[in-house]
């Protein structure tokens, strides 16, 4: 079903069964599959392919040669009807690829709201992106990677399968991330190592001086105190009882499965 206010260029192909919302713009030579739903106000510039069981929200901008919902690159995939879900107000630039999930990984690749995926970024099967993340040019997320909110992944950086990247993390360009990165941390290198707290990012997002100081103290306990992780955890948990801004560290430790970058 195509809403009467939507525009579909004469050279575009929209397969029967697709649901195209109000004021959607589908540009030249785009292909939209039968099991695709595109929300109100979303724009497909040109030569965009949206395939599979894919749901795209409102007011997204998707640029030339982006491929969304295509068959993933997991050799175990056997054609199951797995999905991609994309939220609202995302900017998906040229040649970005976002692959459908796998049964083994829960069947869903999910992108939240207000993200920027720059040219040639790759989001593999079963990845989850929060809100307001940035993937710079040629950044690559392997399967099952999870990014919390406000994460920045630098250009040419690769993130290993199943890694978790905490909120407000910034990973520098040309890095290789092989383990989980706790929230608020700046990481760089191959293999990526911690380089301090993302202070400028926290200031821009309205964190108070007191909150940033508490986060830095938690970081010091984790990385500069000489304590093991098991020794640092209870002290960070105690700090979180006095400063709620530290609680994301505690929550992250409970989720981490690959160990932390050191």
UniProtKB/Swiss-Prot annotation:
Keywords, ordered alphabetically: Acyltransferase, Cytoplasm, Lipid A biosynthesis, Lipid biosynthesis, Lipid metabolism, Repeat, Transferase
Q: Which PROSITE patterns match?
A: HEXAPEP_TRANSFERASES
| Top-rank taxon, per record | Bacteria
* Compartments (UniProt record): Cytoplasm
**Which EC numbers does the record give?**
2.3.1.129
Q: Does the keyword Ligase apply?
A: no
What GO molecular-function term can you cite, just one? acyl-[acyl-carrier-protein]-UDP-N-acetylglucosamine O-acyltransferase activity
Q: Does the keyword Acyltransferase apply?
A: yes
Q: Which reaction does it catalyse?
A: a (3R)-hydroxyacyl-[ACP] + UDP-N-acetyl-alpha-D-glucosamine = a UDP-3-O-[(3R)-3-hydroxyacyl]-N-acetyl-alpha-D-glucosamine + holo-[ACP]
The pathway it acts in is: Glycolipid biosynthesis; lipid IV(A) biosynthesis; lipid IV(A) from (3R)-3-hydroxytetradecanoyl-[acyl-carrier-protein] and UDP-N-acetyl-alpha-D-glucosamine: step 1/6
Main subcellular location of this protein, as a coarse class: cytoplasm
**Which GO BP terms sit in this record?**
lipid A biosynthetic process
Query: Per the similarity annotation, which family is this?
Result: Belongs to the transferase hexapeptide repeat family. LpxA subfamily.
As for what it does, the entry says: Involved in the biosynthesis of lipid A, a phosphorylated glycolipid that anchors the lipopolysaccharide to the outer membrane of the cell.
NCBIfam families given in the database record: lipid_A_lpxA, PRK05289.1
Quaternary structure note = Homotrimer.
Q: Which protein, by its recorded name, is this?
A: Acyl-[acyl-carrier-protein]--UDP-N-acetylglucosamine O-acyltransferase
């Amino acid at each position: 079903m195509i809403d009467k206010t939507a525009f579909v260029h004469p050279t575009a192909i929209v397969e029967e069964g697709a649901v195209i919302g109000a004021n959607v713009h589908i540009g030249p030579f785009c292909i939209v599959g039968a099991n695709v739903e595109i929300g109100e106000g979303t724009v497909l510039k040109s030569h965009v392919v949206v395939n599979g069981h894919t749901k795209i929200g409102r007011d997204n901008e998707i640029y030339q040669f982006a491929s969304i919902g295509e068959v993933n690159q997991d050799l175990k995939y056997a054609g199951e009807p797995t999905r991609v879900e994309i939220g609202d107000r995302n900017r998906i630039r040229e040649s970005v690829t976002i692959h459908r999930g796998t049964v083994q990984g829960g069947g869903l690749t999910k992108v939240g709201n207000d993200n920027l995926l720059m040219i040639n970024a790759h989001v593999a099967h079963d990845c989850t992106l929060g809100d307001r993340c940035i993937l710079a040019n040629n950044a690559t997320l392997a399967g099952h990677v999870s990014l919390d909110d406000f994460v920045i992944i630098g250009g040419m950086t690769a993130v290993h399968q199943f890694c978790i990247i905490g909120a407000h993390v910034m990973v520098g360009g040309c890095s290789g991330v092989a383990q989980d990165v706790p929230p608020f941390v700046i990481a760089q290198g191959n293999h990526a190592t911690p380089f301090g707290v993302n202070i400028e990012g926290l200031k821009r997002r309205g964190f108070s001086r007191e909150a940033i100081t508490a986060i830095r103290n938690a970081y010091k306990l984790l990385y500069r105190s000489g304590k093991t992780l098991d020794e640092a955890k209870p002290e960070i948990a105690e700090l979180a009882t006095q400063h709620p801004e530290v609680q994301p560290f505690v929550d992250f430790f409970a989720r981490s499965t690959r160990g932390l970058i050191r």
